């Protein structure tokens, strides 16, 4: 299959129509969206850029969090090397996006829960390292609530179960307003990771939660993610 490589702009195009449903300011200080269908990566990123733009222009606006699943794609961080792609970009199995987050290449697919957060860190702590560690704690809280012992590894962002990495984190931030977030492998097909060096970690093994809890689905994990986000970010 010959899929496209996309190098995407960090801002919506001038004159781009904003998605009104995802820009509503009515309700709580943080809006949480849980679309039930698979979301194309470009659509989800547009939602984040629109919300970030709104927070730039109206700093008191509501923050936003999305819990969703993507159709298959790969994403590369802003400084990621294409050497971690084990295929030719001209013959990619799925679409590939270079985006404005940190980190190397990762893979998204159905059965993986992705959480995007557009938060104003000035409401919390203007420290990106603190923010990354909070996202790791959200993942560890979630695993604990599921009866699973997870761990962090010093110097490497993410969460592991034994020797298997089950969750990745990659964020972008402009003027202390965040984009992107985290992903956790629940009941997904992991074979797409064989085409990349995940997160640039040579020899790293990738796992999923359903290997430990058969029949676990993303819908089962969402309540625990939301619980921890509420506790740690006051959503």
Curated annotation (Swiss-Prot):
Pfam families: LplA-B_cat (PF21948). It comes from the Bacteria. GO terms for biological process: protein modification process. Keywords: Acyltransferase, Cytoplasm, Transferase. Pathway: Protein modification; protein lipoylation via endogenous pathway; protein N(6)-(lipoyl)lysine from octanoyl-[acyl-carrier-protein]: step 1/2. Its main location: cytoplasm. Residues 59-235 form the BPL/LPL catalytic domain. The record marks 165 as: Lowers pKa of active site Cys. The active site is at residue 199. GO terms for cellular component: cytoplasm. GO terms for molecular function: lipoyl(octanoyl) transferase activity. It catalyses: octanoyl-[ACP] + L-lysyl-[protein] = N(6)-octanoyl-L-lysyl-[protein] + holo-[ACP] + H(+). Substrate binds at residues 101-108, 168-170, 181-183. InterPro entries: aa-tRNA-synth_II/BPL/LPL (IPR045864), BPL_LPL_catalytic (IPR004143), Octanoyltransferase (IPR000544), Octanoyltransferase_CS (IPR020605). Its EC number is 2.3.1.181. It is found in: Cytoplasm. Catalyzes the transfer of endogenously produced octanoic acid from octanoyl-acyl-carrier-protein onto the lipoyl domains of lipoate-dependent enzymes. Lipoyl-ACP can also act as a substrate although octanoyl-ACP is likely to be the physiological substrate. PANTHER family: LIPOYLTRANSFERASE 2, MITOCHONDRIAL-RELATED, OCTANOYLTRANSFERASE. Belongs to the LipB family. In the reaction, the free carboxyl group of octanoic acid is attached via an amide linkage to the epsilon-amino group of a specific lysine residue of lipoyl domains of lipoate-dependent enzymes. This is Octanoyltransferase. The lineage of its organism: Bacteria, Bacillati, Cyanobacteriota, Cyanophyceae, Synechococcales. The gene is lipB.
């Amino acid at each position: 299959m010959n899929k496209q490589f996309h190098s995407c702009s960090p801002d919506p195009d001038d004159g781009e129509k904003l998605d009104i449903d995802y820009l509503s300011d009515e309700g709580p200080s943080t809006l949480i969206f849980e679309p039930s269908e698979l979301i194309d990566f470009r659509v989800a990123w547009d939602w984040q850029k629109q919300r970030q733009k709104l927070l730039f222009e109206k700093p008191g606006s509501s923050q936003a969090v999305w819990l969703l699943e993507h159709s298959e794609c790969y994403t590369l961080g802003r400084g990621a090397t294409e050497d971690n792609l084990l295929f030719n970009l001209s013959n990619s199995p799925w679409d590939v996006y270079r985006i404005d987050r940190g980190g190397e290449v990762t893979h998204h697919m159905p059965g993986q829960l992705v959480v995007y957060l557009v938060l104003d860190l000035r409401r919390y702590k203007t420290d990106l390292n603190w923010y990354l560690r909070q996202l790791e704690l959200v993942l560890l809280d979630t695993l604990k609530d599921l009866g699973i012992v997870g761990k962090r590894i010093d110097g490497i962002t993410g969460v592991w179960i034994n020797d298997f990495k089950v969750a990745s984190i990659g964020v972008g931030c402009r003027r202390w307003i965040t984009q992107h977030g985290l992903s956790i492998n629940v009941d997904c097909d992991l074979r797409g990771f064989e085409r990349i060096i995940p997160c640039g970690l040579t020899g790293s093994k990738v796992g999923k939660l359903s290997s430990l809890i058969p029949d676990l689905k993303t819908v089962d994990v969402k309540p625990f993610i939301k619980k921890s986000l509420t506790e740690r970010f006051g959503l």
